[in-house]
Amino acid sequence: YISKGAKVTYVEKHYGEGEGTGDRILNPTTIVHMEEGSYCEMEMTQIEGVTSTVRETEANLGKDAKLVVTEKLMTHDKQHATSNITANLNGKNSILQIVSRSVAKNDSTQSFHPIAVGNEKCRAHIQCDSIIMDNAKVASIPEIQANHTDAAIIHEAAIGRINNEQLLKLETFGLDEEQAEAVIVEAFLS
């Protein structure tokens, strides 16, 4: 619960490593209730090493509340990651911004499903950008719902591979293809 006028920064970072042979499973659930005029910034990062994850995030925004969510995700090998975010903009003049950036490599799979529900005069923007490599699979399913005539909700989604021109430019500086890809991925997720 975030009280009236309060400001909260929530940071969650995950990286799995080790010599063990078992699966590394991570299924976090975050629920936030935001009172009038409150502000919350969530930064959720998962960079490799987690075999399977299902992230559930729910937010309920009151009057003049603002929520900013930044999600960064990288999967590789046969890893699977699902992220479900539901934000209910219940208060007048509430604001939501979700930015998701992800990279899927090898045979990994990703699914991102953000939902913005405008129940009052509000503004929301969802942006999902993914880089897909090798044999990976990525699904981006932004969902918007307006239950009020003054709800202004926008979503954008883009999935694509690394541009060959970017690789070539970095290779002219002496990087090999693998190093060039690493530079592009790091910059994309930063």
What are these model-predicted stretches?
Residues 1-175, 186-190:
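Conserved beta-strand/loop scaffold segments within soluble protein domains that form the structured core
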